[in-house]
Amino acid sequence: SFLEGMATLRQLSFGLLDIGWHGQDPSSIQRVKDFENEEFQETNLYPDIAENAMSPSFSHIFNGGYSSGYYSYKWAEVLDADAFAYFKEHGIFNREIGEMFRTHILSKGGTENPMKLYKRFRKQAPNPDALLQRAGLL
């Protein structure tokens, strides 16, 4: 879809910034803007506005329970797209796949390692290509 690549890159950059902030000693960061420039180096497509610092207003990564977990937005989309692709491969209303989803995902909740549960359901690790295909990026 239109500008899907930009939206995806934007979310990835937010996740990388979050992990960057929580992956090192904050006292080692001298200037917020320099730190952001370093973190956004791989995802920035356009020149940045020198006076603009995102971190001070990006409350998700400092309060609200997302500390070093902002990436989970995009990861949830990967899981959603990959699980739905599995349903589509076997017929959207396939009873056996639905039962496997209920048995290995829904009924287990947080009682076991989520990746182990997902692999039991899907019989493989989540494939990010499913999200890229759904978004029209592959």
Which role does the model predict for each range below?
Residues 1-138:
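Cation-handling catalytic/transport regions enriched in His/Asp/Glu
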